From Swiss-Prot:
Signal peptide: none annotated. L-serine binds at residues 233-235, 287, 386. Its main location: cytoplasm. This is Serine--tRNA ligase. Its EC number is 6.1.1.11. It comes from Thermosipho melanesiensis (strain DSM 12029 / CIP 104789 / BI429). It is an enzyme of class 6 (ligase). It is found in: Cytoplasm.
């Protein structure tokens, strides 16, 4: 949620933000028109209340002087003012609701360090780690390698659920589980995160609080009878854990990690990554979420990103980090780093994590604050990132660690979790 006071005071900030995101700026004008009417009504209501208070004093004085007829006239006038105030209050509430609904459609303001660009082609590479492997044989894509090993079954998955679902068997299913446990262990033991287990179904308000609704309703799975939503990411329930709460300053930063399955309709991705496991309706992810103070949030983003990178380094998978441009930036994000792992089947890097500073955007919607040393309450800043997406990491291992004989070598750090060094038929 944007800061209405800031919009009122400095609308140019929001005009510029929407221009950088290549979005229509008309919505700002609509809110400002409604806000002017709202403030005009507020002033009128305050004047009417002041007049009614004066009349009440005059009525009391007249009654004390036994001037009941004059007092009755003023009482009638006061009732008329009361009716007018009631109508104005109703109009004011309608304006507030309309402004709130419009404000929910405005994205976060990009940070000054975010490059201006139209789409993902203008994202800026920040750094690379590792060197893509040069094969002395023709490497296979995971969508061929998995079925040949008898460990991935796209056909039966389609029979069960339709397109963009996967069934895995045996050691590949175990590798998925091993990756989850490995990531949770690293983040809890080395990086100091608190593990949390959360529901996979959340109320509509929770999706609004975290910026997923109303914009992404078409992308979401919804249970119509109960109006509960399957989570698109663990970020949603974790961030909402502290909705309507005032945290203590000494508690910050709060750092949570959670493993969940994630559910996305991918309504806007028709024709993208149609083969294999890159873009699924259901996928596993380990999520990292921070709650911190405003002045610390951008340093926290750097640390959060390094925490996610550490997983790929331990797995010895080559990757790069890119700073997303304004045209590719997420709706709720002020700044995002994508971590992209090298995939031989694409001869390119593919996103395996997005690490974002949401600033106070979600905190304003969910009313998450902390009490500072000044004894005043302030909105927290929230951050989130994948630490990592399990399926895409598994794909990266399959493709980068494959052997000419069709087997897959297990990364050294995962051998204790797997109990074997290779996956074979």
């Amino acid at each position: 949620m944007i800061d209405i006071k800031l919009l009122r005071k400095e609308p140019e900030i929001f005009y510029n933000a929407l221009e950088k995101r290549a979005m229509d700026k008309e919505i700002i004008d609509r809110i400002l028109v409604l806000d002017r009417e709202w403030r005009s009504i507020l002033a009128e209501v305050n004047n009417l209340k002041a007049k009614r208070n004066e009349l009440s004093k005059m009525v009391a004085k007249l009654k004390a002087e036994k001037k009941d007829i004059e007092a009755e006239e003023l009482i009638k006038e006061s009732k008329g003012i009361g009716e007018k105030i009631k109508k104005l209050d109703e109009r004011q509430k309608r304006l507030e609701e309309e402004m709130k609904n419009l404000a929910l459609e405005i994205p976060n303001i990009p940070h000054e360090s975010v490059p201006v660009g139209k789409d993902e082609t203008e994202n800026v590479e920040v750094r690379k780690w590792g060197t893509p492997r040069k094969f002395d044989f023709e490497p296979k894509a995971h969508w061929d390698l998995g079925p040949e090993l008898g460990l991935i079954d796209f056909e039966r998955a389609a029979k069960l659920s339709g397109a963009r679902f996967t069934v895995m068997y045996g050691l590949l299913a175990k590798l998925e589980r091993a990756l989850i446990q490995f990531m949770l262990d690293v983040h809890t033991k080395e990086h100091g995160y608190t593990e949390v287990w959360v529901p996979h179904l959340v109320r509509r308000e929770v999706m609004i609080w975290t910026g997923k609704l109303p914009k992404f309703e078409d992308e979401s799975y919804n249970t119509k009878k109960d109006d509960l939503f399957l989570i698109p990411t663990a970020e949603v329930p974790i961030t909402a854990l502290h909705a309507e709460e005032i945290l203590k300053e000494k508690e910050l930063p709060k750092k949570y990690v959670s493993y969940t399955s994630c559910y996305r309709r991918e309504a806007g991705s028709y024709g993208k990554d149609v083969r294999g496991m890159i873009r699924q309706h259901q996928f596993d992810k380990v999520e990292l979420v921070w709650f911190t103070k405003e002045e610390e949030s951008f340093n926290a983003l750097e640390q959060l990103t390094r925490d996610a990178e550490r997983i790929l380094q331990l797995l010895e998978l080559p990757y790069r980090v890119v700073n997303l441009c304004t045209g590719d930036l997420g709706f709720a994000s002020a700044k995002t780093y994508d971590i992209e792992v090298w995939l031989p089947s694409y001869n390119d890097y593919k996103e395996v994590s997005s690490c974002s500073n949401i600033t106070d955007f979600q905190a304003r919607r969910a009313n998450i604050k902390y009490r500072g040393s000044d004894n005043k309450t302030h909105f927290v800043h929230t951050l989130n990132g994948s630490g990592l997406a399990i399926g895409r990491t598994l794909v990266a291992i399959m493709e980068n660690y494959q052997n000419e004989d069709g087997t897959i070598t297990i990364p050294k750090v995962l051998v204790p979790y797997m109990g074997v060094e290779k996956i074979s038929i």
